[in-house]
């Protein structure tokens, strides 16, 4: 009798088959349908100790599942039960053999792919129980895989993407229209299971393993997440997003899950379709799952991946028509907040690029929604570290100009202005607002005069400046309040706020535009924020010519911006306070700030030829030392003249222009009363005097359309009202009486109307304001008395210079004030005096004799900040800047020609362009040798260690050989070589002091020749 051959199964197959219950017990294994626990432990132990057998186990499972899936869809319940057990076995193998998943990854994905195709018999719907177990196995795979096979193994990659596609299709399934009785719970369960699978892929290493395949994966993952997000109500979105912020769990619906970390410590969740008696999931659960999956994906992205996700968001919105603006803005804000901090800037930047790529046509929902999304992001509490503020501003300004050229009243312009204004909400560096205003001013200056839309472009960009200040000021207040630095609002009696006119003095005159104060509650200090620097007056000066634009809408818009600047940005000056003992002439003076080294008279005008010969005690105080931007000459663009023929009546000043000027002057005298008095008093005298001489209309001269007589009367009203404000602020009764008499001599009603109240809440861009013309004067001739000033200028000056309050504030005697106020005033001279005399590094005065002596004295001081003075071919210190130049690592962007200014360069004053920056660095020869530079640096360092400390005595070389050496500590107020006096120095020594040297505007220094 022969032997029967032994046909036993392979051990791995035997262990696998042993995990299943007997065929007769399969139907009774429900509802859990679990493998036999003891045999499953043997299988996992065997596979763990013999990883080489995993491939065979995977192949055997694949064969079984392929057969079971087909039979289960045909209605065979035994095969369906066996399929559920097979998927449980697969998940157990994935969990226990996590280190060797790659050995059976291909079979695993094929098993999952086959299981997702199972349908309920005769109904055709998705079998949620089978799909749930397949999703659990897929999540286990994505949790423990390193993703190295995705993108490398074509078969595996194709199967992986097919699984994602099926999950994406199930995540957007809609069962509400497929039957007469919609099953919302069934739809929500289906979507939740599919979203769980997509969440596993979104949090897996596989999505980031291949740079080439990352876009393909997010093409399958992002749209289903966005569909479920946008189907939720806005209230649900806000609630679920808030929960995500409070709950750090990355899982969409379970908490026992660790997304990252070592593979051995990761945990894969179990999923279930439904538990009998359990209430079905709601739409809020689906929205929460979608948001959490999106949150988990975005948290792991770098800048390139985040940009690609934003592109998919834009593509999704393009497909759905950008119809949900509120949800669009909310999603954009949340996406920005969930991206890592250093990459958040990509969202607004990419959205602005989308706007720039759109064609100039009638605004579409895409225009409005994309712009609203950018504005929402900029206004949100989310910080955008690394945001290129200037680059973003340039794109937005270019878009504004394009839209204005397309349509002067384009509906997108208000939103664009609001978007630009939002750049002031968050501060990322101290000079951010300065740079924004300067960039807007430069863009205004670049507009060609031939541009037909020039006026409207300027008006809109000016509204952008105002909007930036409004948003910045509001953000500053919010930041201060959050820090507990609440500033009490001052009452009108607080110093620095307007005082009711004629309080307790004379009977109130006729009603004037000053009856209501300029600022109802003026702050004692405008800029208090520690987040940023205030807008520099040097930056703002570039915009001042807009007050003289020929178009009234531009003038009125800029006037409001200027008043806002004075209210919120201009630093408060010393406020005079009258004392009863002095009859209203006392003052509270601030200690003048002095700086070491050279002093420039940049805060006062040049009243005449004797300005440089002021005596001791009547000189100007030096402004506090600070890093300031250079002044550039800014003469008016279109100076308003009394032309014989005008294209429009608003080409010259209108009543509302005078009202704006009155408000601006009043604001100046409240914000910086001392500086306003010094610069404004000579102007008021000159304007009153010139109005009678220049604005004269004679019979038949054809100047009726220039409103000559009306403007002259308005000027005199303005001058009288401002003098009355000055008298009230400084407590000078004589000037107050004189101003009131002048006002009483003018016929009523006054030509200057009250200034229009600004909109509340502020409107970032409104329609252009319409000008109002004067009422035509019927007289054809004038008497000779009208050519004289309305106010007695001698009486005004006498009362002004004798005021103890003014003398104490300026620290000048009566004679010094007389010379200060009684000088010849002109627009050109005033602009010259508003600029720096010369930059210490770049410019030199025309008078070399004084300059050489001054430079020699300066170089003997301990003042290293005064660079490279071109006097007696003096040597200068070699520093690291020279080494950087020699190495070629320094890019010098400073040009002596300067950037284009708003100013008109037609005037002879502008024939010489000013330097762009007063701090232009010294330049070395491009051929300088690095070794030589290093030698010079160490040579200077050795000399510096041997130099004596303390007071440095140096003999000033000049034409006179008998001139004595002078001792300097660097504390002098000026460098004049005549009229010097001796005083006590910082160490008690007698040192030379002298009045300020009024150096004229210099010319550029040839640094290369001097060095």
Swiss-Prot record:
GO terms of biological process kind: protein localization to plasma membrane
Region ranges (Disordered): 478-510, 571-636, 891-927, 955-1011
Short name of any one Pfam family annotated for the protein: EFR3
Biased composition (Polar residues): 576-592, 609-625, 910-922
Matching InterPro entries: ARM-type_fold (IPR016024), EFR3 (IPR039786), EFR3_HEAT-like_rpt (IPR049150)
Comp. bias (Pro residues): 489-501
Similarity section: Belongs to the EFR3 family.
Protein name: Protein EFR3
Species of provenance: Cryptococcus neoformans var. neoformans serotype D (strain JEC21 / ATCC MYA-565)
């Amino acid at each position: 009798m022969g032997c029967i051959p032994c046909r036993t199964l392979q051990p791995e197959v035997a262990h696998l088959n042993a995990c299943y219950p007997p065929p007769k017990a399969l139907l009774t294994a429900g509802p859990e349908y679990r493998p036999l626990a003891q045999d499953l432990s043997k299988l996992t132990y065997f596979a763990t100790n013999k990883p080489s057998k995993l491939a065979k186990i995977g192949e055997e499972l694949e064969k079984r599942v392929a057969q079971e899936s087909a039979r289960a869809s045909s209605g065979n319940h035994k095969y369906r039960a066996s399929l559920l057990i097979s998927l449980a076995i697969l998940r157990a193998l994935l969990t226990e053999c996590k280190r060797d998943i790659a050995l059976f990854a291909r079979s695993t994905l094929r098993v999952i792919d086959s299981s997702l195709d199972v349908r309920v018999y005769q109904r055709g719907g998705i079998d949620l129980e089978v799909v749930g177990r397949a999703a659990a196995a897929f999540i286990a795979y994505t949790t423990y895989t390193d993703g190295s096979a995705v993108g490398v193994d074509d078969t595996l990659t194709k199967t992986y993407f097919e699984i994602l596609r099926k999950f994406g299709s199930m995540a957007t399934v809609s069962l509400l229209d497929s039957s007469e009785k919609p099953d919302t719970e069934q739809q929500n369960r289906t979507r939740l299971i599919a979203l769980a699978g997509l969440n596993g892929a979104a949090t897996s290493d596989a999505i980031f393993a291949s740079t080439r395949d990352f876009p393909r994966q997010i093409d399958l993952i992002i749209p289903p997440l966005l569909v479920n997000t946008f189907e939720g109500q806005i209230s649900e979105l806000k609630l679920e997003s808030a929960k995500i912020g409070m709950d750090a769990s990355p899982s969409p619906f379970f908490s026992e899950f660790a997304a990252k970390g070592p593979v051995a410590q990761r945990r894969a969740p179990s999923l279930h379709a439904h538990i009998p008696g359990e209430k079905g999931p709601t739409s809020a659960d689906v929205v929460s799952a979608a948001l959490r999956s999106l949150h988990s994906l975005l948290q792991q992205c770098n800048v390139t991946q985040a940009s690609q996700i934003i592109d998919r968001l834009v593509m999704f919105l393009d497909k759905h028509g950008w119809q949900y603006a509120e949800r669009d803005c909310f999603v954009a804000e949340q996406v920005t907040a969930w991206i890592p901090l250093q990459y958040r800037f990509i969202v607004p930047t990419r959205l602005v690029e989308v706007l720039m790529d759109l064609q100039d046509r009638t605004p579409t929902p895409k225009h409005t929604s994309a712009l609203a999304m950018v504005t929402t992001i900029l206004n949100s509490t989310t910080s955008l570290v690394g945001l290129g503020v200037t680059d973003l501003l340039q794109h937005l300004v270019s878009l504004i100009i394009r839209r204005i050229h397309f349509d002067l009243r384009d509906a997108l312009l208000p939103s664009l202005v609001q978007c630009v204004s939002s750049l002031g909400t968050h501060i990322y560096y101290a000079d951010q607002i300065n740079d924004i205003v300067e960039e807007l001013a430069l863009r205004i200056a670049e507009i060609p005069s031939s541009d037909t839309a020039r006026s409207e472009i300027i008006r809109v960009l000016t509204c952008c400046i105002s909007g930036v200040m409004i948003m910045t000021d509001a953000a500053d207040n919010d930041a201060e309040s959050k820090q507990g630095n609440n500033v009490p609002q001052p009452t009108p009696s607080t110093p620095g706020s307007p005082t009711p006119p004629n309080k307790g003095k004379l009977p109130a005159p006729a009603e004037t535009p000053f009856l209501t104060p300029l600022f109802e509650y003026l702050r004692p200090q405008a800029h208090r924020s520690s987040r940023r620097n205030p807008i520099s007056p040097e930056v703002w000066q570039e915009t001042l010519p807009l007050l003289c634009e020929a178009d009234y809408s531009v003038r009125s818009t800029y006037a409001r911006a200027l008043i806002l600047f004075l209210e919120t940005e201009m630093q408060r000056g010393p406020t005079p306070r009258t004392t009863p003992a002095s009859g209203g002439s006392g003052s509270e003076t601030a200690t003048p700030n002095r700086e070491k080294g050279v002093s420039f008279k940049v805060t006062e005008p040049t009243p005449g030829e004797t300005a440089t010969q002021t005596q001791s005690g009547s000189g100007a105080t030096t402004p506090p030392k600070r890093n300031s931007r250079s002044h550039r000459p800014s003469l008016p663009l279109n100076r308003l003249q009394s032309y014989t023929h005008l294209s429009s009546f608003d080409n010259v000043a209108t009543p509302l222009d005078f009202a704006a000027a009155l408000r601006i002057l009043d604001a100046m005298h409240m914000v910086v009363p001392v500086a306003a008095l010094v610069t404004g008093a000579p102007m008021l005298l000159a304007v009153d005097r010139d109005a009678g001489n220049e604005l004269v209309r004679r019979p038949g001269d054809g100047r009726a359309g220039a409103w000559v007589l009306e403007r002259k009367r308005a000027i005199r009203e303005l001058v009288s009202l401002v003098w009355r404000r000055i008298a009230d602020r400084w407590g000078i009764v004589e000037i107050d009486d004189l101003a009131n008499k002048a006002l009483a001599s003018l016929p009523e009603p006054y030509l200057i109307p009250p200034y229009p109240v600004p909109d509340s809440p502020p409107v970032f861009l409104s329609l252009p304001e319409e000008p109002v013309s004067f009422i035509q004067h019927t007289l054809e001739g004038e008497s000779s008395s009208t050519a004289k000033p309305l106010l007695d200028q001698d009486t005004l000056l006498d009362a002004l210079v004798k005021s103890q309050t003014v003398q104490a504030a300026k620290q000048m005697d009566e004679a010094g004030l007389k010379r200060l106020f009684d000088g010849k005033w002109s627009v050109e001279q005033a602009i010259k005096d508003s600029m720096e005399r010369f930059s210490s590094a770049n410019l030199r005065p025309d008078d070399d004799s004084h300059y050489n002596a001054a430079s020699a004295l300066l170089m003997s001081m301990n003042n290293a900040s005064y660079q490279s003075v071109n006097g007696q071919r003096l040597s200068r210190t070699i520093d690291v800047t020279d080494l950087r130049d020699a190495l070629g690592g320094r890019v010098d962007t400073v040009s002596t020609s300067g950037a284009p200014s708003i100013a008109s360069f037609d005037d002879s004053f502008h024939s010489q362009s000013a330097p762009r920056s007063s701090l232009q660095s010294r330049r070395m020869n491009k051929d300088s040798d690095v070794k030589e530079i290093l030698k010079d640096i160490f040579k200077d360092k050795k000399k510096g260690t041997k130099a004596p400390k303390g007071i440095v005595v140096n003999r000033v070389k000049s034409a006179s050989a008998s001139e004595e050496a002078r001792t300097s500590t660097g504390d002098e107020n000026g460098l004049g070589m005549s009229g010097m006096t001796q005083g006590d120095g910082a160490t008690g020594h007698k040192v030379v002091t002298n009045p300020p040297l009024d150096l004229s505007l210099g010319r550029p220094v040839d640094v290369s020749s001097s060095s």
